[in-house]
Each structure stands twice: as C-alpha cells, then as structure tokens.
Amino acid sequence: MPQAVAGPEIERLIQLLGRMPGLGPRSARRAALQLIKKRETLLAPLADAMRIAADRIVVCHACGNVDTSDPCTICRDETRDPTTLVVVEDVSDLWALERSGAVKARYHVLGGVLSALDGVRPEHLTIALLVERASAPGVKEIILALNATVDGQTTAHYVTESLKPLGLTITRLAHGVPVGGELDYLDEGTLTAAIRSRTAF
C-alpha cells in the first residue's frame, strides 16, 4: 500500500476524486492539487456548489431527469412538443441531446438497459412508467435514443414490443457515419448501419 503523502483530509479528497468515472489515482492527485492551489477561486466555490446540490437535487417523478425541482425544468416547459417522448438510457444521454438543441420534446429516462449479464430485468427500469406516459392523450411518437450496444438494441426491441399495442409511431436514432468521420476509420458494423439507413441527398 502506498504511503500517504499528505494529511488525512487531503488523502480523503484524493480518494473521493478517484471514485469519479475516468479519474484514476494519478488524475485524482492532479485534480486535488489544482483544487488546493486554487482554494479561494475553485475549491471553496466547488465545495459550496456541491453542498447545495446535495441538499436540493431531486429526481423528477415524471421523466427521471435530475434537477432542483420536481417536476423538472424540462417537464414544466410548455414550449416543448407534448406529442413526442424521447426515450434515453440515462440522464447523461438526456443532457447530451439537450446540448445538441436538435429536439424540443419531452424525455423519459429508463435508468439503464436490460442486461442478462448484469441481471437487469424490465422491472428494474422505468418501462412500465413509460407505457403509462405514452398512453396519455396527445402522445403520437416515441423516439428511441438508446445506445447502439447489444444491451441497447435488446432494450429498444423490448420497449417497442411493450408500446406496440398503443399504435404510436416508434422511431429510433439513425446509426452510421459521424459528422466529420472518415470511412477508413469506421468499423464494419457502423458502415453496415450507415448503408442500411442511407437517405436521399
């Protein structure tokens, strides 16, 4: 076990930062040092923001987004298209779509994907709530914005079957060549998906 190089408070900060996705021990140490160096301009404001977030953040009972109000800002936004529900795996996917500005609809966060390997079954996700929301008067289209993984595809098929009796239009995001992508660098699966979902130019 490596020897501690600082007091227990700093070691705890490094440990906690190291639990963040994408931050290993070395990156956590660097981040902790940056926070310590910029104590007044970064560490103190960050600590305040985290304290406030811990006290006020809630999960929206309607869509599953995280916000400081329930229903969330998106669900309360009356300018959004009430006829369309965009289904995503996680809040991070919802935020990515919002950053793109490509859709001005309402969302539904499943809370994950079906996975036999990880033991995630339909009752572990918010699929029943999705069916209930999709049954509401005025809903016409469900956009499946799920990741193009095996578990994502399995979940998309299950959700489609669950919603089929409602007679709604069910669409999914196109798969294929990313903007700025070069064909030579793409895998065969991506190229196949791009060919199959080609559109008129």
From Swiss-Prot:
Superkingdom assignment: Bacteria
Zinc finger region(s), C4-type: 60-75
Gene from which the chain derives: recR
Every Toprim domain range: 83-178
Family to which this protein belongs: Belongs to the RecR family.
Job description of the protein: May play a role in DNA repair. It seems to be involved in an RecBC-independent recombinational process of DNA repair. It may act with RecF and RecO.
PANTHER family, sorted: RECOMBINATION PROTEIN RECR
Record-linked InterPro entries: DNA_Rcmb_RecR, Rcmb_RecR, Rcmb_RecR_Znf, TOPRIM_dom, TOPRIM_RecR
Keywords: DNA damage, DNA recombination, DNA repair, Metal-binding, Zinc, Zinc-finger
Coiled-coil region list: none
Pfam family membership, one: Toprim_4
Protein name as it appears in the record: Recombination protein RecR
NCBIfam families documented for this protein: recR
